[in-house]
Amino acid sequence: MNETQIQRETRQVVEDVLEKTNLKQGALFVLGLSSSEVLGGQIGKESSQEIGELIVETILGILGSRGIHLAVQGCEHVNRALVVERQVAEQFGLEIVSVHPTLHAGGSGQLAAFKFMQDPVEVEFIKAHAGLDIGDTAIGMHVKHVQVPIRPILREIGHAHVTALTSRPKLIGGARAHYPQDAIRKF
């Protein structure tokens, strides 16, 4: 698999999703990543530290330039805990948990986050504003309600299926209520 191509596809997808979601500075963005799927393997079976680092470093650069915070979801072996910067955990009141990821418990994306973040910690749960799922890792539990699917410009990064979610406020009030224009869904 060509690393330049994976980096280019990652950049394209992330920039497209950010454009479609219109996230503001300070937002939380969750990443689910299967490096095995990127390489054409089965999720959790052929993890690649190099691919994890390439993708996470690329995404951190893009989000960091916009002031958006990255949370990297781990696999079920760490109860889908997430790596964030300690400052983000404190700012959002997130519960820090005690676990350090490995290649096969947490995964390559979490290991990369520990390598490239300034002061990484694991947290149990978040409610992100949006997120990207590379390899069908199931990020929905970490995106706040109401979740809105986003169709990325590319359907795959490497060989991994790619999906994205954003969120919007709940519509409440019933038939007599009026709602502001929504940037994601037009009423």
UniProtKB/Swiss-Prot annotation:
Pfam families: DUF436. HAMAP family: UPF0340. Belongs to the UPF0340 family. Coiled coil: none annotated. This is UPF0340 protein SPD_0576. It comes from Streptococcus pneumoniae serotype 2 (strain D39 / NCTC 7466). InterPro entries: Antibiotic_NAT-like, DUF436.
